Swiss-Prot record:
Tissue: In the adult brain, expressed in four neurons of the lateral protocerebrum project axons towards the retrocerebral complex.
GO molecular function: corazonin receptor binding; neuropeptide hormone activity
Organism listed in the record: Apis mellifera (Honeybee)
Keyword Ribonucleoprotein: no
Function statement: Cardioactive peptide. Corazonin is probably involved in the physiological regulation of the heart beat.
Listed name of the protein: Pro-corazonin
Amino acid sequence: MVNSQILILFILSLTITIVMCQTFTYSHGWTNGKRSTSLEELANRNAIQSDNVFANCELQKLRLLLQGNINNQLFQTPCELLNFPKRSFSENMINDHRQPAPTNNNY
């Protein structure tokens, strides 16, 4: 009697474990078999995206330094400022903040 209960408990726990592992595998996007896109396309797409996005500012600065693009202002700029997207300002907004030209030609 005790042996049969232990066997039933073992089979039940094994079944639950297998179901949980299968759910974990499929919930994280793991696939078996052929992928829909080739590895070259995937690598090219990831390379383009990583070049366009400043995911890690310090690595981007290091890459520019190693390529020989030395710009001291860029290296001293905080990464928080580099992560903001560029804004397009209207001409009226630019004119509102523009300094007036001097009238006596003294710059």
